[in-house]
Amino acid sequence: LEDVAQAHGSTWKGRYLGTFGDAGCFSTHERKLITTGEGGFILTDRQDIAAAARVLVRYGIENDVGGVKLGSNYKLGAIPAALGLSQLAKLDAKLTGRKRIGDQIRAALSGLGWLTEFEIEPSSVHNGYSLVYQVTDPKIEVWPMSEWLAKEGVVSDTWRYRYKPMYNMPLFQPYAKQCVNAERIIPRTITFPCHEGLSDEDIAFMVDRIAAAPKAGAS
């Protein structure tokens, strides 16, 4: 089961993410590259998984049989579905725009010695959902800095969603396993937007705020 909620259009070794496992689960939340406002879809080439998914989203009803299990009404309405299809037609243009803007932001941030971008595997294509960096200077407190940036309008997902290892969340604590690398990496991680709607002025403002953030966040 692939969690590819943010991976629309991304590839690895020439193959689309979401096609490696038995099923790929995508989100179509309003901030994703393909959006229906809310919702998502499952990508699978297994007939049994596709059939089970159709039953689940249609109240547990199987065609020609009727109710076979308890289900829910998870069907996407016609209007959001039409919106999603229109977004799909724009995906290639979005990927191109995000690459251009991402490269522009990377170049502008390259002089900040306290920031290091997570390496993108050479045989992969990154869709530009966001740029992900590590704050490598141990003297910089990442959380206050992220909070200050958010107030300035540059919001990191690690701050927005309060990232932490999942086993630190109440739901998963009974299954906790210590993941020392996650414990070390997450508190030093920060993300920056690079969507195709950013203008040159937006990028200049964002880079200026990021450059000022370590001192401003510490004050």
Residue ranges and their predicted role:
Residues 1-2, 26, 44, 158:
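Hydrophobic residues in well-ordered beta-strands that form the structural core
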Residues 1-14, 46:
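Catalytic PLP-binding core of fold-type I/II PLP enzymes
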Residues 2-4, 28, 119, 194:
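A cross-domain feature marking catalytic cores of carbohydrate-active enzymes
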Residues 8, 17, 28, 34, ...:
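Short clusters of hydrophobic/aromatic residues that line enzyme substrate/ligand-binding pockets
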Residues 11, 47-219:
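PLP-dependent aminotransferase class I/II
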Residues 16-18, 208-209:
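Glycine-rich, phosphate-binding/catalytic loops in enzymes
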Residues 19-56, 78-81:
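Active-site PLP attachment segment
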